[in-house]
């Protein structure tokens, strides 16, 4: 495979010492992986990975607590990958995976993170050519709005 892809920027950032893997959380991972070794490697580096199955097993409150444990007192950049949302609600992405969060769940999670010191953020993987009736664009804008409100502590 290729070393640099849309699915590997954070691995490369860890390899290049640009981010601290012990202060990195992945929430909602599910479905097929390009390389299962990437998941093992991330865990070995200290990345906190909460799969979608882990989330539902742990429950909302324990999941949020875990995120706070990792990110407490840390300047944090927030990337929201739109394919974390189920394609029923956000079909316009290059890698749709069934079984993701619904929009309300995503909003609730983002709002619960309002005590984290977010210093920036983005919404990635929105692909208008794959979208249906601008659904994904609307969801992406909604998620970006929620993130901005959380970053400015407006809930």
Language-model features, listed with the residues they occupy:
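Conserved alpha-helical scaffold segments that buttress catalytic/binding sites
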Residues: 1-155
């Amino acid at each position: 495979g290729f070393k640099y892809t849309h699915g590997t920027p954070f691995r490369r950032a860890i390899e290049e010492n640009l981010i601290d893997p012990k202060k990195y959380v992945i929430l909602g991972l599910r479905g097929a992986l390009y390389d299962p070794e990437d998941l093992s490697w991330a865990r070995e580096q200290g990345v906190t990975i909460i799969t979608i199955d882990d989330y539902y097993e742990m429950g909302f409150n324990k999941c949020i607590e875990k995120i706070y444990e990792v990110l407490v007192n840390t300047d944090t950049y927030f990337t929201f990958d739109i394919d974390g949302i189920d394609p029923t609600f956000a079909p316009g992405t290059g890698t749709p995976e069934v079984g993701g969060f619904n929009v309300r769940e995503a909003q609730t999670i983002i709002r619960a993170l309002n005590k984290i010191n977010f210093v920036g953020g983005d919404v990635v993987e929105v692909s208008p050519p794959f979208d249906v009736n601008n659904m994904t664009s609307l969801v992406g804008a909604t998620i970006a709005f929620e993130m901005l409100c959380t970053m400015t502590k407006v809930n």
